[in-house]
Each structure stands twice: as C-alpha cells, then as structure tokens.
C-alpha cells in the first residue's frame, strides 16, 4: 500500500489515518476509496499474506475496482452522453489498464473469448482462476451496461 501512497494515489485523508492499523496474517484491509472525477472512482483492498502481523501500509494490493457512475445510454440526450464519455476519457489520463476504458463487451470477447463465467443478470464476463493457498479466486471481472454494452466496471482480484 505504501507504494501507491508514495506514487500519489489520492486516498481520502480519513482513510489514510488507518495505514498504521494492524492487519492480522491472512486478513484483508477495509476498502480504500479514490475519486478520480465526478463520474469515475476506484476502490482498493490490501492483504497480509505473511506469517506475522503487519500494518496496513505494508500490506499487498489484493483488489482494485474501477467504476463509472454513468456511461452513455441510448435514451440520454447527446450532451449528457458527451459529458459521461468525456469523464471516462478524462479518467484514462490518470488510470491506465491494458485495455481502453471505453471497452465494449463485443471488443473484449473478440480479443479473448476464453471467459470462465458469463452472468447475464449483471451483463458481466469473468476470467478467474482458483487460489492455490486461500479459499477464493483471482482474476478479472468486467461488467457492462445492459443497454450499450459499454464497460461500466472492472475489478481485479489477487490471491496467491
């Protein structure tokens, strides 16, 4: 976690007050929130995989979630859609993944159709593997807007 703080991630001051808190072995921290702009935010969680207690600042990144509160919709007017698109594009200046933040479900599946799970209720696609050490899994979960199939949320989780 300290690397992200040193790198300039603008965690909330009230949450940074917790970085000295103890994290027991095999436990995760609470969720840290970062507002990228009025429409885009991120969340982070950290894990202690050592055999001893450590502080939250020493814990390893185990979860990242990027999400847009709003994405363009077919029933929104053009100016509203332009505003949402601009907020997402603006967030891409501060947050980089190996795919565009304007990714559509079709584009994702064209590049990799080996998903481990499809969820029609959430219009999501997952690429996950089971952890070899802990109960749970690691991987990517992409959630798309049901109307436009535009990416609205990505979460990346890691367990050894």
Predicted regions and their residues:
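A cross-family detector of function-defining hotspots
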Residues: 5-71, 83, 87-150, 156-160
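Flexible internal linker/loop segments at domain or repeat junctions
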Residues: 76-83
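Extracytoplasmic Gram-positive cell-surface binding/anchoring modules and repeats
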Residues: 1-2
């Amino acid at each position: 976690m300290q690397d992200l703080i040193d790198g300039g991630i603008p965690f909330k001051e009230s949450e940074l007050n917790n970085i000295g808190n103890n994290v027991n072995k095999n436990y995760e921290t609470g969720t840290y929130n970062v507002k990228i702009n009025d429409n885009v935010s991120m969340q982070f969680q950290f894990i202690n995989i050592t055999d001893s207690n450590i502080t939250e600042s020493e814990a390893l990144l185990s979860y990242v979630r990027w999400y847009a509160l709003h994405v363009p919709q077919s029933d929104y007017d053009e100016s509203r859609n332009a505003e949402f698109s601009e907020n997402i594009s603006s967030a891409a200046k501060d947050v980089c993944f190996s795919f565009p933040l304007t990714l559509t479900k079709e584009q994702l599946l064209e590049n990799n159709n080996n998903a481990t799970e499809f969820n029609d209720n959430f219009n999501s696609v997952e690429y996950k593997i089971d952890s070899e050490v802990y109960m749970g899994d690691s991987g990517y979960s992409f959630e798309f807007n049901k109307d436009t199939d535009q990416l609205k949320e990505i979460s990346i989780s890691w367990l050894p």
